[in-house]
Structure formats: structure tokens, C-alpha cells
From Swiss-Prot:
SMART domains: ANK (SM00248), SOCS (SM00253), SOCS_box (SM00969). GO terms for biological process: intracellular signal transduction; protein ubiquitination. This is Ankyrin repeat and SOCS box protein 15. PROSITE patterns: ANK_REP_REGION, ANK_REPEAT, SOCS.
Length: 583
């Protein structure tokens, strides 16, 4: 224990010394800032041209003009920066020997040092030359990247080896404490990780989010690197700052071999992150089917219940129908509700997986859930209202065919006497007809207390239909349709809307307010002719049969097909002549 403490103290002391040196270099850069804003001399232009063209003899002549080496172009590039990205080593040696050492660490306007430029260019010999001359190997560019990190990003083993040979800091943190070991794990470079570990690289380093290299390898699905890190002491049980386990990271990566390996070494599928999400939720959301197959049997029902949401919710939110089907096959409940604290974190207070599918406009997931028995009437804001508002005709058709309540109200904000759905379909005749054909209570649109032109009020009897399970029968009678539709910015719609509505009624009681608006619209003559003449017996029979059958049977194609009626009559009962979407 004491030996390890001494080793850690030595490591920290060494790093402090390196940091002081780097800060000293950066401070000197701030003080000594050569003639960047001065117009470039002819000698500087000739010097740079000789570097770019590889003309060594001319270069040896021009480097005698020391002031030319101290001039930078508009990008902040000195001749030394130009030299480090040229493949001819002698050019770099010539310029480097002629330049003041203070220039060796100067950065371009993009924040790159000569060493980071050489590493990015992939010029190993130039990197070795710079290091041989004494260039400091740990100076970061302005992006916070060390030369070692850049070399690993490029995947250059030789360059990494060269930097290590010249005592570069292996554990030096970069932006968000991302280290060389993390980057090697991300790139899946087992050889580079082995090299780092052989030179006392730290397998337990954490980045700015508390993730270890083991977690990074798991997230990016590098199974060979993952196993190697485990054998070298990587902690399978390590948790990131957000509580995410290594297995949780692997679930996000989706590699089933990584998940199998972590489970073999003791990883648990029942460890949630701070948000309460389990690895199974992550895999379902990301759509990792094979990973999900591994996680289903190792995740307890109690852990899922405690989390407050099911993998069904996650798969629906992530729009992954195949994962949904797998979860349904394994007995997960499609009607499970979000816990209250999760539901209340959404403005709409959604509760079901079906709501996620509908709000994502995901037809496939919606169909999978409905076919598996999802109830479309469990959310405070009915799924049907979401689909109507989004103008998704096919999803509306699906929901209605599986029993969605066409006459639902959004109880949290409802202030109308008529069911809510029509409010979102006034500009879309196809959607409006779809609702009306499926049993929208159109008579409630004419239920008001204004009275007709003779002063008589309209009082409707209770509907003859029985409420379906899960449907609300509560109606807050406040704002009638005539008040809603005759506001100045919607007056122009009144004629067209009323003309459509009367196709679904027998008696049309127009109140004085609605009639006064209709009389100045072009549809009025046709509307007046219809309401002043009796309906056909055929239409009256249709309305009566529909009331007797009830919505539940009308909306199910199988029930309609069982009726002992000719096909033409069945079509007439369903208002197929007005089915613009079906046509």
C-alpha cells in the first residue's frame, strides 16, 4: 500500500514539473511575439519558397537572415512551421538550427505548434528530429490536444513510440481530461494500449465524465481491447460520474461480444445510472437487437420496475420496431405506464410507449404496439389528438381502427363542449372526414345555448353509445363550437366546415350566431337547401344503424365484415363515399 502511494506521489511530482515547464514556455510566447503584423520581407518570401520547393542550397543562403525566420504570414506560420510539414528532413534541420529556440514552441493562428503540425502531417522522422533537438513533447495545441493524442488519432504506432522514447507524459489530460489511453481505447488499438501500459500508462484514468478507458472500449465495441484492459487491471465495476456502468456503455455500443465478455467477468444488468436507466433501456433505445437478446435474461423485473420505465418505452422512443417485437415476444407489457416522476418531466405528461411512437410519427412502431394490444386511450393527451395535430393520416387511421376514442377531450386544458380532435382538422378535409367517418359526435358541434332565430335553445339528449374501456365520459361544457369557429381569424372556414358536418347529421339546428356568419358565405345556398329539406330515408337508416352498432364495432373491420349485408351496404354504413383518405 505504501509502495503504491510513493509511486503515485512521484508521478504527481513529475507531472507538476512538466506542467511548470509548459506554463513557462507559454508565458514566454506571450511576452516574445515577433513581427507578425509587419509586412513580410523579400528574404522571408524567398526563404519560405525555398522550403516549399525543397531547394536546400538556396535555403542555406536565406537562413542567414535571422529576421526572415522571425516573420509570420497571415496564418501565423513562421518558416519553421513550413519546414516541419515538408518531407525532406534536411530542410527541417537547417531551419531548426537557424531559428531561435523561443520559436520552437510558437503557435500558428490555428493554435498548432511545430511538433503538433509534424505529427498531424504524419512525418515520423520530422517528429524525431524535433524531439532530438530538444523540442518539448507535451505542449498542447489550442484544441487541448497533446502530440501523443494526435499521434494516436492518426493511428501511427511509430510516432507514438517515438514520443514515448522522448519522455512524453502518458497520462497528461487533454480537453475534458481525455487521455492518450482513452483515445487508444476509442480507436481500438490494442498494440498502442500495450505500448502505453508497458511504459506505466494508467488503466484507471477517468475523463471529464468519469469514464475509464475500459468504458470507452466498451462503448466503441472493441472486444479485444476490452479484454486486454480487463486482464491489465481494468475495473469492470467502475461507474462514470452519471452512474453509468461499463456494461451500460457497452449496451450503447451494441457489440454483443462486449456484453457477453463483461457479463462473464461479473458485470450486472441491474445497475442503473443516476437517471435510473439500465443497460437494457440503452440497448433498446439505440436499437441494438443482439445486445438486447443478451440483456433480457440478465435484467430483473424488479430492477426494471424500480427504474420507472420499461424497455418497451425506450424502444418506442428510439423508433426501433425490431427491438419492440423482441421485447413483446419476451413478455414485456405494451401498456406499462411511466412512473409519475418521469411522466411529469414531459410537458404533455405522456405515460405509454404508444405515445412515444405516435409523437415520433413512427407508423411501424405504432402498428407493432397496437397489434400487440396497446391501449390508445391511456395518456392524459390522447394519442389520437397528437396524430391529428401532426396531420398523420395513416397513424390516425390505425389508432381509430384499434379503438382510439375519436370523441376524447384533453382534460388538462379543455374548455369546449365538443370533442377536441376537430380543432386540429379544420384546414384538412381528409382528416376531418376521417374523424367524422369513424364516429365523431358531430351533433355536439351544434350544442349551444344561443338559441335559434326564434329564441329556442337546443338541448341534446345523452348519447346512446356506451363508453369504451379507458374512455373518459367527462365533458366540460364551456365554449360551444359556434363561439370557437366564428372568431375573426377563422370566420372564413365556417361555410366549408358546416357543409361537411351536415353530411353526418339528420337534423341540423343552426343557432342565430352561426347562421348570421353562414349567410354571407358562398356555401350558404347549398347548406340552406340541405337543411330545409328532409333527409333521405337511406341516410336516416344509416345513422340509426351506426348508433345501434356503437363505435367499438364500427371501427373494427372484422366486425363490419361479419354483418349479413351486401358489400355496397357495408360501404354505405361506413361513409365510404366520403372517405377521401381511402380513395
Amino acid at each position: 500500500m505504501d509502495i503504491n502511494d510513493d509511486s503515485n506521489d512521484d508521478h504527481l511530482a513529475s507531472y507538476d514539473i512538466q506542467l511548470c515547464i509548459q506554463e513557462s514556455i507559454e508565458a514566454s510566447q506571450a511576452i516574445f511575439h515577433p513581427k507578425r503584423l509587419v509586412q513580410l520581407s523579400d528574404q522571408n518570401r524567398k526563404l519560405v519558397e525555398a522550403i516549399r520547393q525543397g531547394r536546400i542550397f538556396e535555403l542555406q543562403e536565406y537562413v542567414q537572415y535571422k529576421y526572415a525566420l522571425e516573420e509570420a504570414d497571415e496564418k501565423g506560420w513562421f518558416p519553421l512551421h513550413e519546414a516541419v510539414v515538408q518531407p525532406i528532413q534536411q530542410i527541417l534541420e537547417t531551419v531548426l538550427d537557424a531559428s531561435y529556440k523561443t520559436l520552437w514552441e510558437f503557435k500558428t493562428c490555428d493554435g498548432e505548434t511545430p511538433l503538433t503540425l509534424a505529427v498531424k502531417a504524419g512525418l515520423v522522422e520530422n517528429v524525431k528530429t524535433l524531439l532530438d533537438k530538444g523540442v518539448w513533447p507535451n505542449t498542447k495545441n489550442d484544441k487541448g490536444e497533446t502530440p501523443l493524442l494526435i499521434a494516436i488519432k492518426r493511428g501511427s504506432y511509430d510516432m507514438v513510440s517515438a514520443l514515448i522514447k522522448y519522455n512524453t507524459s502518458l497520462d497528461q489530460p487533454c480537453v475534458k481530461r481525455w487521455s492518450a489511453m482513452h483515445e487508444a481505447a476509442k480507436q481500438g488499438r490494442k498494440d498502442i494500449i500495450t505500448l502505453l501500459l508497458n511504459h506505466r500508462g494508467n488503466v484507471h484514468l477517468r475523463d471529464g465524465f468519469g469514464v475509464t478507458p475500459l468504458g470507452v472500449a466498451a462503448e466503441y465495441g472493441h472486444c479485444d481491447v476490452l479484454e486486454h484492459l480487463i486482464h491489465k487491471g481494468g475495473d469492470v465495476f467502475a461507474l462514470a460520474d452519471d452512474g453509468a456502468s461499463v456494461l451500460f456503455e457497452a449496451a450503447g455500443g451494441g457489440n454483443p461480444d462486449c456484453i457477453s465478455l463483461l457479463l462473464k467477468y461479473g458485470g450486472s444488468g441491474n445497475v442503473p445510472n443516476r437517471a435510473g436507466h439500465l443497460p437494457i433501456h440503452r440497448a433498446a433505445y439505440e436499437g441494438h437487437y443482439l445486445a438486447l437478446k443478451y440483456l433480457i435474461p440478465v435484467t430483473s423485473k424488479h430492477a426494471i420496475q424500480k427504474s420507472g420505465l420499461t424497455p418497451i418505452h425506450s424502444a418506442a422512443e428510439g423508433q426501433n420496431a425490431q427491438c419492440l417485437e423482441l421485447l413483446i415476444e419476451n413478455g414485456f407489457d405494451v401498456n406499462a405506464l411511466l412512473a409519475d416522476h418521469i411522466s411529469q418531466s414531459y410537458d404533455d405528461e405522456r405515460k405509454t410507449a404508444l405515445y412515444f411512437a405516435v409523437s415520433n410519427n413512427d407508423i411501424h412502431c405504432t402498428e407493432v404496439l397496437l397489434a400487440a394490444g396497446a391501449d390508445p386511450n391511456l395518456d392524459p393527451l390522447n394519442c389520437l389528438l397528437v396524430a391529428v395535430r401532426a396531420n398523420r393520416h395513416e397513424i390516425v387511421r390505425l389508432l381509430l381502427s384499434y379503438g382510439a376514442n375519436v370523441n376524447c377531450y384533453f382534460m388538462h386544458v379543455n374548455d369546449t363542449r365538443f370533442p377536441s380532435a376537430i380543432q386540429y382538422a379544420l384546414n384538412d378535409e381528409i382528416m376531418l372526414r376521417l374523424l367524422l367517418n369513424n364516429g365523431y359526435q358531430v351533433e355536439l358541434c351544434f350544442d349551444c345555448m344561443h338559441g335559434n332565430i326564434f329564441g329556442n335553445s337546443f338541448v341534446w339528449s345523452e348519447t346512446e353509445e356506451e363508453g369504451l374501456p379507458g374512455w373518459t365520459s367527462c365533458i366540460i361544457k364551456d365554449n360551444p363550437f359556434c363561439e370557437f369557429i366564428t372568431v375573426p381569424w377563422m370566420k372564413h372556414l365556417v361555410g366549408g366546415i358546416v357543409r361537411i358536418l351536415i353530411d353526418y347529421m339528420d337534423y341540423v339546428p343552426l343557432c342565430a350566431k352561426l347562421k348570421s356568419v353562414l349567410e354571407v358565405q358562398r356555401e350558404w345556398p347549398e347548406i340552406r337547401q340541405i337543411i330545409e329539406n328532409p333527409c333521405s330515408l337511406k341516410h336516416l337508416c344509416r345513422l340509426k344503424i351506426r348508433r345501434v352498432m356503437g363505435l367499438q364495432r364500427l371501427c373494427q373491420p372484422a366486425s363490419i365484415q361479419m354483418l349479413p349485408l351486401p358489400a355496397a351496404m357495408r360501404r354505405y354504413l361506413l361513409f365510404k363515399e366520403f372517405d377521401l383518405y381511402g380513395q
